[in-house]
Amino acid sequence: MESAAHHRTSSHRGDGFVGVIYGDIGPTSFRCSVVEAVERMEFVQVVHETCGTVLGRVEEIQRKTDLSLDRAQLVGDGEPVNVEERVSAQVSVIGYRDDRRLLQVPRTPFRAGEPVRRAETGTIQDVLGLTEDKKHGAYAGLLSGHDVPVYLDINAMVQKHVSILAKTGGGKSYIAGVLIEELMKHRVTCVILDPHGEYASLREKGKVAHGASRFHVEPRAYADAIQIFSPDTKINTGSRPLKFTLSNLDARDILSLTGSARVRTHLTALRKALDLLRQATKDYTIRDIIRVLEREEDPQNASLIDELEYLSEVEIFAKEGTRIDELVIKAKTTIINLKGVPPDIQELVVNRLATAMFELRKLGRIPPMMLVVEEAHNFCPQVGQIASSKIFRTLASEGRKFGLGLVVITQRAAKVDKNVLSQCNTQIILKVTNPNDLKAIISSVEGLTASMAEEISRLPIGVAIMTGGGLEMPLMVEVRPRETRHGGESVKVIED
C-alpha cells in the first residue's frame, strides 16, 4: 500500500480548541498536542474522515521540558533560566453513533494534524446515550466537568441489583440517600436495613447546599412516604415495634441467638421444653420457655435460663409478630432501624425479614421492591458463614426474577461475599484506597479502563464512578446534593 503525504495547516483554532493529533495514530487511541489547558478524564471530540465527529476521553496528560537537573539547581538558587516545555495528551476513543444508533469505534486511524476540541454537550449526550429520562430514571448528578445530567434506569437497578462502594467517610450513605430520594419520587417500594439509624433523616428537609443551583435541586422532606420500625423502641423512639414469633425457630436457632458456649449441654433440655409448649399452643414466648425449664428443677438448666433471660430482655419476640405486609407497602419506604441492637439480634432480624420478603415476593403477595442493605459486609461476609449469608446469595442470584432488587452498601468491598457483589450490575464507586477493596471492585466492574481504575483512589468527595443502570460505560459523576437532611455525618470532637 502506498503512503500519501498530506498538508495540514494551523487554521483550526476556535471555540474549544485543545490541540492537534500527532505521532503514531490508531483508530482507538491517539496522542495530541495540548495548546489550551485540558484535564485528565475530560471529554474531547475530533472529526474522522469517514465516521464524522467522534468522542474521546483524555486518559493521560504529560508535560515534557528541557529542564535538566543542573539547570533546576540554578532555578533553586534564584537564577533566571529559560525552560522550553510541551504538553501532550493520550486520548482513548469512545466512539460515535452510526445510522442505526449503535455505538461504534472507527476501523481506520485518524489523520495526523486533525484538530482536537473540547466535546460539545450535544456530542457527549448523543454518544454516551445520556437522555433526561425523568419518567424511568433516577437523577444521580452531573457528568464530571460538564453540566450534563446523568440518570440511572430504575428498572435496570431493580432487575440487576446495585452496589455502593466507598471507604469509611467516603459518602456512601449520602449517595444512598440520593438514590432513595429518587426511588421515593418514582413511588418504588423500599425497605432499608439501617444498622446505625442514619436514614430516619429522609423524613426531614435538608439545607440548600453550596453550588446546588447547578444541579437544580431544592430541599424537600419525604415524611409522608416513610415508616420506621425497630426491635428496640426505647433507644429508637418514634419507631413502631418490630416483633417476631418463635414458632419458626428450632432449639438450635434459639441457642445460636444466646451465644451459648454449651450448645450440646442445653440442646436436649430446650428441645423438650419446646415440644411441651407446641403441644399446647403455637404462640409462645421466651418467658414461656423459661417457665417450663424452671418447673423441671434441673440445676443444669440454670445457665440456660440465664441466657434465655437475655433474649427476653431484648424484647424482640412476641406471641404476635409484625406482619410483612405491614412492613412492605406499595409505593412506601420502610426503615428498619437497628441502632443499638446487638449484632447477633441484627443478624436474626435481617435473616428473618429478607427470607420472608423473598418468599412472599415469589408468591406475588408483596409488590416489586428494593431491599437496601447498609454495612452489607456484616450480613453477607466473604469469610465465614452467618445466619443471613444464604438468603443474600439467593437474593443476588434469583431476586431479579421475582422483582426483588438489592442495594448493597459497604466500605469494605473485599469483605462482602463475592457471589453477592458480582451480581450487582449497577455500581456506584466513591473513593476507595484499601488495596484489597480496590482489587475486589476492579474485578467486579465491567468496562473499567486502567486509567479509571487508578482514578478510584483519587476521587474527590462528591464524585463517583457509575456503571450499569442503563449507562453504556463507566462515567465519573458529580453526585447531586441531597434534598433531605443527611443523617450520616461524623461526630465532631471539637465544635466549630
Predicted regions and their residues:
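P-loop NTP-binding catalytic core
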Residues: 99-157, 476-478, 482-483, 488-490
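Hydrophobic residues in beta-strands of the RecA-like P-loop NTPase core, especially within AAA+ ATPase
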Residues: 193, 373, 409-410
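Long, basic/Gly/Ser/Thr-rich N-terminal segments
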Residues: 2-122
